[in-house]
Amino acid sequence: MSTSDMIKQLCEHMNISVAELARRIGQTPQNFNKKLQRETVTLKELITIADALDITYEQVFILHSGAKIKTGNKDAS
């Protein structure tokens, strides 16, 4: 699933439009839709989206040893 598809699915689950999400993160709907179409949403923007919706965003690398290297908008230790 692409990042854009994940964001659209998230909007459906949160019962908001993509345009409303754009406004909540301080972007115009037109600009945000272009980013979705081009798949150019940044990690910083993903974290901003999670913060705006009061949810957790996490990105994880899982090593062969089972150790995890994480980043996200909440405690990513």
Q: Which residue stretches match the model-derived regions?
A:
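Alpha-helical residues within the helix-turn-helix
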Residues: E12, R23, D51
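Helix-turn-helix DNA-binding elements, focusing on the entry/boundary residues of the two helices
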Residues: I7, V18, P29, L43-L46
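Amphipathic, hydrophobic secondary-structure cores in small proteins
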Residues: N33-K44, T48
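The DNA-recognition helices of helix-turn-helix-type DNA-binding domains
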Residues: T28, E39-T40, A67
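A short, Lys/Arg-rich alpha-helix, primarily the initiator
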Residues: M1-M14, E20
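DNA major-groove recognition helix of helix-turn-helix/homeodomain DNA-binding modules
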Residues: K44-Q59
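Short, charged recognition helix plus adjacent turn
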Residues: Q9-E12, K34, V60-S77
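Short alpha-helical DNA-recognition segment
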Residues: N15-N33
